[in-house]
Structure formats: C-alpha cells, structure tokens
C-alpha cells in the first residue's frame, strides 16, 4: 500500500515522502498512530499544494533576508563603550550589543543569534562582523567600537 508520511518514521522515510509499505503495517500501525495517510489522489494533490506553499514561503524568506543584508551592509555601526586608559573595554562587546546597535540605526530588529562573533570584542577599533540570516544568506557588516563620549 502506498502511504504519505506525516512525520519522520525510522527505517521508512521522512515527512512528506510517498512510500510503499505492507498493508498490515499501514492499517495497523502507521495510519492509526497518525504517522501516515493512504496515498489517495486527493491526499497527493493536497501534498503537492502544501509543498508548493512551503517553497513559496522559503523563496519569500530568502528574498527578505537578501534585502535585509543589503540594508545592513549600507551602514557603519558605531558603538560607544566605556574603556580603560589603554583602550581596552570594561567587559566585552557581545552579539546582543551589536544587534541593539543595528536595531537603533536601521529600525530593523535582528536576532542576536544571527550575528557571529569568533571571539568577544575587547578593544576599540573597526571590525568586520559576519551576519548569518535565514536560508543561508551570509555577509559582513562593519562595526566601529568607539570610546564613550568621543563619537
């Protein structure tokens, strides 16, 4: 019997796949547990429509991510911080601080998990920071760490 998997099933397949399984396994286990549906023409049509909708959503998210990255790359983000005498920061500049600076400058909220810091920033200077957005969109933005009061 052909079934459409509604969830990932070990040793059978992943969600959305059409698989051929024994009638008993389908009727007594997969279908009653809500793991699969019989692959009727109506179910297949619904599955196809759902896949198309998911693809459209992915395209939309990718386009929005590309536009956001272009917007982010247009600006230089100056972040004022308190420092000691030698230009070292009290504490460290984190991805949350950078996300806040981006939000203030562009008006676009960006999640701190999208900002990748290899190591915390502990000194004044100009840095290129990697930004990883949804759908694999990555790029670099410029962040300048300046002493508070000397903008």
Swiss-Prot record:
Q: Which UniProt keywords apply?
A: Ribonucleoprotein, Ribosomal protein, RNA-binding, rRNA-binding
The UniProt family comment states: Belongs to the bacterial ribosomal protein bL9 family.
Entry GO terms, CC = ribonucleoprotein complex; ribosome
Q: What is this protein called?
A: Large ribosomal subunit protein bL9
Q: Does the keyword Ribonucleoprotein apply?
A: yes
Superkingdom to which the source organism belongs:
Bacteria
GO BP: translation
A Gene Ontology molecular function term for this protein is: structural constituent of ribosome
- Listed InterPro entries: Ribosomal_bL9, Ribosomal_bL9/RNase_H1_N, Ribosomal_bL9_bac/chp, Ribosomal_bL9_C, Ribosomal_bL9_C_sf, Ribosomal_bL9_N, Ribosomal_bL9_N_sf
Organism source for this protein? Thermosipho africanus (strain TCF52B)
The record's section on PANTHER family has: 50S RIBOSOMAL PROTEIN L9
Pfam family of the protein (one)? Ribosomal_L9_C
Q: What does this protein do?
A: Binds to the 23S rRNA.
């Amino acid at each position: 019997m052909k079934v459409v998997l509604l969830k990932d099933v070990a040793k059978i397949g992943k969600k959305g796949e059409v698989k051929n399984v024994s009638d008993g396994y389908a009727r007594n286990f997969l279908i009653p547990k809500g793991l699969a549906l019989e692959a009727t023409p109506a179910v297949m049509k619904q599955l196809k429509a759902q896949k198309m909708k998911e693809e459209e959503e992915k395209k939309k998210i990718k386009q929005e991510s590309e536009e956001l990255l272009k917007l982010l790359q247009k600006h230089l983000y100056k972040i004022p911080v308190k420092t000691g005498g030698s230009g070292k920061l009290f504490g460290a500049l984190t991805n949350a601080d950078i996300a806040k600076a981006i939000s203030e400058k562009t008006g676009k909220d960006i999640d701190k998990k999208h900002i990748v810091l290899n190591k915390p920033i502990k000194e004044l200077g100009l840095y290129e920071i990697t930004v990883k957005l949804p759908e694999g969109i990555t790029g670099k933005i410029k962040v300048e760490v300046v002493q508070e009061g000397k903008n």
